[in-house]
């Protein structure tokens, strides 16, 4: 059975390491803030000018003045800081972000990503994604394995406008965890109840499969 959005976020949260500074992109990635392991300290950054994001607020306790880059209300942790976007992007471009988690429309087996524009649909711009893919030390994509029409998002070539090339290291989808290696996609884990055959069928590129593939632990 495929994961829902929260399941994807839970699995991404297992990639966080103590001391990391992490930027969470719009969409599924923002949910990761709810699942940061309690035994580590991670500082979450939002490019609109907030360092030290906490979980989403409980119902009825939201502060409308506290929002992330996706305009969602958030909470802050002790020691959090607010600043303008120029300083926020100085942090990003200066290489001070250890990990970025982004959503995507397409990802290739070489690590290319398209995440900001679908021709014919109105968009407000790419936000901070291009700066993030060019500067972050590690990039994970959190996404569904296929689009709403059932077509693979994991491909050999991006057909949509690119955000960055050869930058994505890992994909966590509703079906699988896949590393991007020098030889292409490599299957690491599968979602509970999902077969290797289903993953291969729904991936638009060859996938390396070595030995028994374990189920994800959430």
Language model: regions and residue ranges:
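N-terminal active-site beta-alpha-beta segment that forms phosphate/nucleotide-binding
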Residues: 1-77
